[in-house]
Structures are given as structure tokens and as C-alpha cells.
Amino acid sequence: MIEKIEGFEIKTNNDSPRIIDIGINDELLNKLIFPFNKFDITALEYKPFTRFTIAKSLDDLSNNKLSKLLNEILRDRNTGCFIIKPKKMISKIDNNFLVKLSTAVAHLIGKPNYDAMAGKYYARFFVRHEDESDSYLRKAYINMDLHTDG
């Protein structure tokens, strides 16, 4: 399954043969900066075509091989998981670039779902020890009552 795609270093993870590590080379990252910078994060949120466009930019740089590989990995019961990331964090890569990259990867796999809690098509999680929200979903110890008033 592991094939060679120019601009990517693809190998089996050292800890588990079920995980495929995909490193994105600096040269390819530099080619992504211009098409990714055409759109800001707000455009990604509200304009579906922008999400498609950045996904296409990523896939075009791999001659449409990356989307095929990612889907094969996820559908293969012997693997089912991949880690894709820049090989090196170059100075032009920031959090917004990484959100755009993950959005592009998600769209290469399939149509992503809308995250209603975050209100976005992508998710950014800040991991903290405490959660002060009032959501019942995050408080398993609170009884949920069923209402019969319609």
C-alpha cells in the first residue's frame, strides 16, 4: 500500500504497523503557502468552495495520488490510521496554515461534518484540566431529565 508520492515521505510508524506516517516536505509546503493564503479562516467557515479549493491544491501537488492513498489507508483493516504533518515546521507555517492543511486533508477523505458545538467545519480544541461549560454532554454525572411537554 505504501507508495512513493513526490513531496511526501511515507512510511510505517515506528510504534505500530497500523499507523502510516506521512511527512510533507518543505518544497511542497512552500508550494501550498500561496494557494492557502488566498483564503482566510472566515472564508473556510462560510464558503464551501474555498474548502474544496484548498483540498484540490493539496491533491494537485501529488498528481491526485494523495486523496487515493488516504482513502486506501482508512479503508484497509490492516492500517486504518495515518499521521500527516510537515516534516519540519518552517517559519511560514502558523496555526492558520495548519487549520487549512487539516481542512484540506479532511476534504480529500470525504465530505466533513459540521461541528455544531464549535460552529465550524473544522475543530480546534484547547485541552485543559477543567471545563466550565454547562453542557450536559460534558457532565456524565448529572442526570438528564426527559421532558414530556413537547
Identify what each model region corresponds to.
Residues 1-150:
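Fe(II)/2-oxoglutarate oxygenase catalytic core
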